[in-house]
């Protein structure tokens, strides 16, 4: 008997109860996080333990991930740097500089809209769009 991994089911499970934002900004990742922390009251920090390393075209690319876990809640925010040295973590979103994943708890529409509006008003932010997992 041959076992097969159902990747579609894994993807569906991973994205269950998540919200995903794509952000275009003219800011460096640390500058963007500093503004998020100041304006949203969050505490995004670089997490080198979950940094993504990709090897493409015989070169290594490193994509930083900033993380913030809300107090008294399982909700965790991950901010992925989508571009490194001309290569993209998610090439289908080349126009997005950052991908923001909210995971491990339900984020209602009011909270998500508040986050989107606050981020849109930050200096250097050009676009904030909610993305789907499809």
Per-region residue spans from a language model:
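Glycine-rich, aromatic-bearing surface loops/beta-hairpins
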Residues: 98-102, 107-134
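Short, well-structured hydrophobic secondary-structure segments
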Residues: 24-70
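Short, Lys/Arg-enriched, disordered terminal segments
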Residues: 1-9
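Conserved functional micro-motifs across diverse proteins
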Residues: 11-15, 31, 49, 53, ...
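Long, continuous compositionally biased terminal/linker segments
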Residues: 4, 56-94
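Short cationic amphipathic helices and targeting signals
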Residues: 18-25, 96-106
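Short, surface-exposed beta-strand/loop "edge" segments at domain boundaries and coil↔beta transitions
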Residues: 27-34, 73-76, 86-88, 106-111
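Terminal, regulation- and interaction-focused segments at domain boundaries
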Residues: 8-29
């Amino acid at each position: 008997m041959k076992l097969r991994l159902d990747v579609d089911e894994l993807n569906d499970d991973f994205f269950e109860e998540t919200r995903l934002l794509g952000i275009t900004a003219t800011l460096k990742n640390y500058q963007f996080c500093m503004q998020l922390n100041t304006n949203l009251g969050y505490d995004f920090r670089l997490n080198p333990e979950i940094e993504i390393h990709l090897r493409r075209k015989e070169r290594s690319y490193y994509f930083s991930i900033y993380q913030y876990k809300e107090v008294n809640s399982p909700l965790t925010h991950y901010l992925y740097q989508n571009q490194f040295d001309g290569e993209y973590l998610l090439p289908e979103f080349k126009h997005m500089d950052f991908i923001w994943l909210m995971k491990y708890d339900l984020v209602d529409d009011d909270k998500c809209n508040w986050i989107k509006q606050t981020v849109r008003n930050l200096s250097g932010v050009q676009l904030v769009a909610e993305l789907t997992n499809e």
